[in-house]
């Protein structure tokens, strides 16, 4: 991207850093990962989990959620002020799974938030270590992106459910900072802005007074984040219009919906980071690996290497396929929910299949599910090759895609053509070209019209053998262009509900 020079790298966002060189970035990301690992080891000790139970992804999710809840200032304050029956605002907890006489049992644990915060800070040299908290939020977000297609959320705001490839990070909390903003898709930002504008339409005081001023600042900041994701001047100019509007209303909602659609072809830059569950970092630290000393990157070979040697287990329901559960988690670990399945399959070395064909539900187990029939199995999270994660939309071109999803958002920097259904997308652009933004709209539509399906994105970029740590010998894969590339194809994925 042209403005790359003014941007901080993800690692800098991740670690709240000022400009750092590559070694310093690797060290500070390593420090963050090491902190998560140390915290996890300590929590396993507190909860008396044995090695196997500590590597169970469901236990990892509960422990991660406990620390995120302990540090959720706004919610904690809200809970203190609005006490609800049977909920202690000072406590946090969740289901912990243990093996008792050859059967898996669920045990609900409860801890003081203060105690959890103490353990977390102790593991992070006394710091609050917000970067580590954000890292866990992004892992949860990537898992949600892989598990659920946000059809309802899209429809509610008047967008097409087939635009799901724009929805990365849609379940990230607002407090996820710059690192969180970097991984949010164009659709996610548009959704947040539309919700805000709708509130303003319904509530006359939304933009008024001292609170209204803060709201306005937040609105403009979100507009700027979204503007920064677009790669064409016309899209950015339209964002300026939306941001500068005196009184945001339906015209702005229309402009935003238009921009979201345009992003299916003129894709935005969305960062991708491999964020792994805490139960991967814990055992690595326990085995004596020093992340800070060795350095770590979320966008290079490191997460692949870590997953090659990690043992992670998962509870499996009686009608689920363990291989399918593994695929779900592999995609989440690599932030590949909206990647082309041809590319994911090549990197993983086994066929990655669409969501609707997976016999697996989400990773979390609901409190009313029967534990008697639960078994556990090893998650297969290894890969055949590794590839660099991209933060660009890889725009040059396009191609046909599927019924359930009409575009993709690339994760890996690997040469290929990008599938999307041009006729379907362009059909949405008939009619309405009047109003303030008509010239920009016309220009955007022209760029979309001229996009050529045959062109190749990420020219010359390839995948690498796992032994090729320096990324010296790229292997440029060739893909069957006629093949289907979308994950949420024809979709019967579950709906995500908070």
UniProtKB/Swiss-Prot annotation:
InterPro entries: Flu_NP (IPR002141)
Record key words, sorted: Capsid protein, Helical capsid protein, Host nucleus, Host-virus interaction, Ribonucleoprotein, RNA-binding, Viral nucleoprotein, Viral penetration into host nucleus, Virion, Virus entry into host cell
GTP-binding is among the record's keywords: no
Motif placement: Bipartite nuclear localization signal: 198-216
Residue window of motif Unconventional nuclear localization signal: 1-18
Gene Ontology cellular component annotations, sorted alphabetically: helical viral capsid; host cell; host cell nucleus; ribonucleoprotein complex; viral nucleocapsid
Residue stretches of biased makeup (Basic and acidic residues): 8-21
Region (Disordered): 1-21
GO molecular function list: RNA binding; structural molecule activity
GO biological process, one term: viral penetration into host nucleus
PTM: Late in virus-infected cells, may be cleaved from a 56-kDa protein to a 53-kDa protein by a cellular caspase. This cleavage might be a marker for the onset of apoptosis in infected cells or have a specific function in virus host interaction.
Chief location bin: virion
Location in the cell: Virion; Host nucleus
Family: Belongs to the influenza viruses nucleoprotein family.
Function description: Encapsidates the negative strand viral RNA, protecting it from nucleases. The encapsidated genomic RNA is termed the ribonucleoprotein (RNP) and serves as template for transcription and replication. The RNP needs to be localized in the host nucleus to start an infectious cycle, but is too large to diffuse through the nuclear pore complex. NP comprises at least 2 nuclear localization signals that are responsible for the active RNP import into the nucleus through cellular importin alpha/beta pathway.
Assembly, per entry: Homomultimerizes to form the nucleocapsid. May bind host exportin-1/XPO1. Binds to viral genomic RNA. Protein-RNA contacts are mediated by a combination of electrostatic interactions between positively charged residues and the phosphate backbone and planar interactions between aromatic side chains and bases.
Official protein name in the record: Nucleoprotein
Gene: NP
